[in-house]
Every structure is written in C-alpha cells, then in structure tokens.
C-alpha cells in the first residue's frame, strides 16, 4: 500500500484500497482521500467542468444519507459507486461508513453552484434513508427491511417505495419532499413545517398520520386502526379507509376527500377554524366541532347513529347523510343541518340554529329548530 498518509492518492489507488466487500477501513479511507482533514476554508464554487470517479464497491449497507446538494441514486443495476462532480469540488467530497450507514458530504465551510451526482449499488439490507440541506435520494428498489425509516428535511427530497413486514416511519419537515408508496404492518407518518408527502399508504394494523405547520399530505390511506391529526394551517387531501378512525383538525387546518369506516366508529374533532369537507360513509359517527370550525359531510350513505356536538360559532352540515338516530347538541351561535329517519334528539341553546330533513321524530321543538322546506 502506498504511503497514503503523506501524499494524495489517485482514484485508481483508492479503488485498490477496497476489500472484497467494498469497505474501506476508517483510518485508511480518511488518509487515502485526504478529505477529512482537507476542508475548504473559503467559499467552494463549482467550476462547471464535470468529472467522474469510480469509488469502488459499496458492499452491504443498511442506511444512506445525503446532504449539501448530493443527488444520490440507489440502483440495482450499478456495480460500483460512481461520483460525478465539478473538477474543483470532487476532491472535497467525503464518503463515511458509520455503523453500516453510508454518509455523503462535502468538506467546505460554504458552497456555491456545485453539482454532485452519485450512483450507489443497491443493498438488500437498506432500511434507512435520510436527506437534508437540498440533498436528494432516488431509490430504485423497494425498501424491504424488517423495519424502515425515512427522514427528509431542509429542502431535501426522497423518492422511494417502502414495503416492509414490520413498522415504517416517515418524517418530512422544513420544506422536505417525499414521493413513493408505503406498505407496512404499522405506520407512523409525520409531515411538518411546509414539508410535503405524496404516497399511497397501506398498513395492515395501525397508522398514525400527523400533519402540521402548513405541511401537505396527499394520496390514499388504508389501515385497520387509523389516527389522523392535522393542525396549524396544514392540509390533507386523501381517501381514508379504516375499520376505526380518529381524526382531529384544528388551527385552520383542512381535510378534503373521502372517509370510509368499515366496522367501528368514526370520531371527528374539528376546532379553531379547522375544516373537514368530504364524503363520509360508516355505521356510526361521533363528531365534535367548535370555535368556528366546520364539518361538511357529503354523500347519502346509511349511518345507524350519530352523536354530534357543535359550539362556539361552529358549523356542522350533513344534509344528505342518511342517519337513523341523531343525538345533537348545538350551542353558542353554532349551526347544524342534518337529515334523520328515526329519532332526532336535539339540545339547542337560544343562540343556536338547527335545520333538519327526513321522516324523523323530533324530541325537542323550539323556534330555532326548523324543518327544511
């Protein structure tokens, strides 16, 4: 082995340092690249003249991390790691192996107009992807580990399909983006701070979706037990299918789409200017809307029973939903518009307003309760 601790090593010599598994010893790799100690003190500006280096085999790895403008493609067709970058930038690029995770970064205090493209051979053990600081990862193979975690932040983006027999975790924040699909036993999806995710989700057991701070989620979700929390101006446009559903919407957040609850009860809570606008079908409904929140349920599905609380300037509207029995409480300048075929029990304060339709029996009658014409 050449005296790599004293002089720079050419790309061909770097390739020879790889063992049969594609791994480089940490100390040798640092010295060979002379990169960990080689840090650009001033601004590193890309020249626009692109060169490509072969960094040898990747070996088996469980995670991959992209940061600082790295554009990484995980390809089943690739045999070795291929790196393309500006000719004055490529010597400041670093690949570290940390506990089975490949970490790509650039050793510079600041950068300008750099372009780094990396192709990495796929690993069957890959189960963790992270991207931040405008980094990108495009994984062209499904992530099939026993559990899978994907994290995207700071304008990063990840494109990947998750197909695991275990748990899946997705965390997208700070203008990060995720596109792909999720299949798992139990899923936890958190989208926040202007992040966005477009992914059909199918969980055999439970799924929890949390969307906040002007973030966005779109596509279909199927789960046995589904919890959805939307807050702080966030929005969800989706078709939700579950055996049991709990949904909370507040702080001017929005949901639009379709909700189907196959077996047990759907629980909807909307407050603080939040809104639910969608088609609903299910056997039982429990809804609470307050503080100028809005629930507008479309469709004429058959519902056995519904318990609804409307307060503080809120609005509940389900004029076509075919509910057999209603238990309705409306107060403090709130409004409700419902359809009922059986028993309609109403508790309405003097400042509230209720309109109804259907061949129902109304248990409470007052001036602020009126049949629709």
Residue ranges and their predicted role:
Residues 4-153, 157-173, 177-212, 216-231, ...:
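Acidic (Asp/Glu) and glycine-rich low-complexity loops/linkers
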């Amino acid at each position: 082995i050449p005296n790599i601790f004293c002089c720079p090593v050419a790309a061909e010599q770097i390739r020879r340092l790889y063992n049969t598994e594609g791994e480089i010893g940490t100390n040798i790799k640092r010295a060979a690249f002379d990169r960990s100690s080689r840090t650009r003190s001033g601004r590193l500006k890309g020249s626009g003249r692109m060169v490509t280096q072969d960094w040898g085999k990747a070996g088996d790895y469980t995670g991959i991390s992209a940061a600082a403008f790295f554009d990484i493609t995980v390809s089943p067709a690739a045999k070795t790691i291929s790196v393309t970058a500006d000719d004055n930038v490529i010597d400041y690029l670093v690949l570290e192996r940390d506990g089975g995770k490949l970490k790509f970064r650039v050793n510079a205090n600041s950068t300008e107009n750099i372009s780094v493209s990396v192709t990495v051979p796929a690993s069957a053990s890959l189960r963790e992807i992270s991207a931040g600081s405008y980094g990108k990862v495009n994984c062209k193979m499904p992530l099939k580990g026993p559990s899978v975690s994907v994290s995207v932040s700071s304008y990063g983006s990840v494109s990947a399909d998750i197909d695991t027999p275990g748990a899946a975790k997705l965390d997208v924040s700070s203008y990060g983006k995720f596109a792909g699909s999720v299949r798992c036993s139990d899923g936890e999806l958190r989208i926040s701070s202007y992040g966005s995710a477009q992914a059909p989700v199918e969980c055999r057991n439970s799924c929890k979706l949390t969307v906040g701070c002007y973030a966005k989620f779109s596509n279909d979700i199927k789960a046995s037990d589904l919890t959805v929390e939307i807050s702080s101006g966030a929005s969800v446009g989706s078709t939700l299918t579950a055996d049991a559903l709990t949904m909370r919407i507040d702080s001017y957040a929005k949901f639009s789409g379709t909700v189907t609850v196959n077996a047990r009860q759907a629980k909807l809570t909307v407050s603080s200017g939040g809104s639910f606008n969608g088609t609903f079908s299910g056997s039982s409904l429990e809804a609470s809307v307050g503080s100028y929140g809005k629930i507008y349920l479309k469709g004429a599905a058959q519902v056995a029973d519904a318990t609804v609380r409307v307060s503080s300037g809120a609005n509940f509207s389900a004029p076509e939903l075919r509910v057999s029995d209603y238990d309705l409480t409306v107060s403090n300048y709130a409004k409700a518009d419902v359809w009922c075929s059986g028993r309609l029990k109403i508790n309405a304060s003097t400042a509230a307003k209720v309109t109804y339709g259907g061949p129902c029996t109304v248990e409470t009658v007052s001036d602020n309760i009126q049949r629709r014409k």
